[in-house]
UniProtKB/Swiss-Prot annotation:
Native source organism of the sequence: Gillichthys mirabilis (Long-jawed mudsucker)
NAD found in the keyword field: yes
Protein's job: Interconverts simultaneously and stereospecifically pyruvate and lactate with concomitant interconversion of NADH and NAD(+).
Protein name: L-lactate dehydrogenase A chain
PROSITE patterns hit by this protein: L_LDH
EC numbers: 1.1.1.27
One MF annotation (Gene Ontology) recorded for this entry: L-lactate dehydrogenase activity
One of the Pfam families matching this protein, by short name: Ldh_1_N
Main location: cytoplasm
Gene Ontology biological-process entries: lactate metabolic process
Segments passing through the bilayer: none
Leading EC class: oxidoreductase
Pathway in which this enzyme or protein is active: Fermentation; pyruvate fermentation to lactate; (S)-lactate from pyruvate: step 1/1
Primary gene name: ldha
C-alpha cells in the first residue's frame, strides 16, 4: 500500500470535466509572459496553456509559473510546442511574432509576421474552433486582419488588443496633469495602435464635464496648456520604454488581462479594440482599427457609434488608408 493509498480513501469516481475557462497564450516572450501572469493574478482561467517554438524557454517559463502555483487559484498550467495542448480554449491570445530589425521596413516586418501567422492561426483553429482570438502581436491592426482572413472566423471572434493600452496611457498622463486617478479621467484613443492613432478630444471629460468646453483649443495649435503634448507622450511612450529597458511588457500584459476579463466574465464593458471598421466613419476599405466596442462571452458584441468631429474623422480615414496601403501588398 502506497503512502497516497494510506492517506486517502476514495469515495466516488471522479468524472472528467473539461476546463470551462481555458486561456492559451501563444508566444512566451516578454509580452506573452506579462499577459500570462496578469491573467493568472486576476484568476481569469481554470487552465492556462502556453505555446512557443523555443522549447527550452517554454519549459523554463512553465516550470517557473508552476513553482508558484501555491500562490495562485489556477493549478493547471501546461505548455508544449504542439498545439494539441491548447485544445478547447475559450480565449487564445497571440503575442508571437518577429521583432523589427534595425533598418527593416514595416512592410517587410509585416510579411515576416504573416508567414508566422500562416502556421499559428490554422493550428489554433484546428484545436479550438470555437475560441475567441485575441491578437497582440505588432503591427496589431494589420495582423488582426491577417488572423481574421486566415482563421475564417466571424469578425466578432477576432479582436486586436488595439488602442486599449494607448487609451490607458492617455488617461494616466491626463491624471498626472490634473492630479486625479486615471479611472476618473475619461478619454479615448482610436484608430491605429501606433503613430497615426487619433485622440478624441471632443469626448475628453472628468465627471461628465467636457474639458473642451472649458478649453476650446484643447488638442489644437495655440493651446496655452499644450494638451496636444499628452497625445504625443502616448505615441512616444512605447518608444521611450523600449529605449530604456529594451521592450514593453507590464502595461500591455495588464491591458490583455483587462480584455480577457471582460470576455470570460461577460462584463459587457466598452473597450477601444481593433475590429473591422469598413463602412464606419467614412472608411471604405477592409481594415481593422480601434473603435469603442462591447466585449462579452461571445466576443465583440457591439460597436459604439462615436460622434467624431470632422478633423477626427479625417484622421481616422487617413489611418485606414495607410493600413490598406500595406495590407493590399501582402500575400496571404
Amino acid at each position: 500500500m502506497s503512502t497516497k493509498e494510506k492517506l486517502i480513501s476514495h469515495v466516488s469516481k471522479e468524472e472528467a470535466v473539461g476546463s470551462r475557462n481555458k486561456v492559451t497564450v501563444v508566444g512566451v516572450g516578454m509580452v506573452g509572459m506579462a499577459s500570462a501572469i496578469s491573467i493568472l493574478l486576476k484568476d481569469l482561467c481554470d487552465e492556462l496553456a502556453l505555446v512557443d517554438v523555443m522549447e527550452d524557454k517554454l519549459k523554463g517559463e512553465v516550470m517557473d509559473l508552476q513553482h508558484g502555483s501555491l500562490f495562485l487559484k489556477t493549478h493547471k498550467i501546461v505548455a508544449d510546442k504542439d498545439y494539441s495542448v491548447t485544445a478547447n480554449s475559450r480565449v487564445v491570445v497571440v503575442t508571437a511574432g518577429a521583432r523589427q530589425q534595425e533598418g527593416e521596413s514595416r512592410l517587410n516586418l509585416v510579411q515576416r509576421n504573416v508567414n508566422i501567422f500562416k502556421f499559428i492561426i490554422p493550428n489554433i483553429v484546428k484545436y479550438s474552433p470555437n475560441c475567441i482570438l485575441m491578437v497582440v502581436s505588432n503591427p496589431v491592426d494589420i495582423l488582426t486582419y491577417v488572423a481574421w482572413k486566415l482563421s475564417g472566423f466571424p469578425r466578432h471572434r477576432v479582436i486586436g488588443s488595439g488602442t486599449n493600452l494607448d487609451s490607458a496611457r492617455f488617461r494616466h498622463i491626463m491624471g498626472e496633469k490634473l492630479h486625479l486617478h486615471p479611472s476618473s479621467c475619461h478619454g479615448w484613443i482610436v484608430g491605429e495602435h501606433g503613430d497615426s492613432s487619433v485622440p478624441v478630444w471632443s469626448g475628453v471629460n472628468v465627471a461628465g464635464v467636457s474639458l473642451q468646453t472649458l478649453n476650446p483649443k484643447m488638442g489644437a495649435e495655440g493651446d496655452s496648456e499644450n494638451w496636444k503634448a499628452v497625445h504625443k507622450m502616448v505615441v512616444d511612450g512605447a518608444y521611450e520604454v523600449i529605449k530604456l529597458k529594451g521592450y514593453t511588457s507590464w502595461a500591455i500584459g495588464m491591458s490583455v488581462a483587462d480584455l480577457v476579463e471582460s470576455i470570460v466574465k461577460n462584463l459587457h464593458k466598452v473597450h477601444p479594440v481593433s475590429t473591422l471598421v469598413k463602412g464606419m466613419h467614412g472608411v471604405k476599405d477592409e481594415v481593422f482599427l480601434s473603435v469603442p466596442c462591447v466585449l462579452g462571452n461571445s466576443g465583440l458584441t457591439d460597436v459604439i457609434h462615436m460622434t467624431l468631429k470632422a478633423d477626427e474623422e479625417k484622421q481616422l480615414v487617413k489611418s485606414a488608408e495607410t493600413l490598406w496601403g500595406v495590407q493590399k501588398e501582402l500575400t496571404l
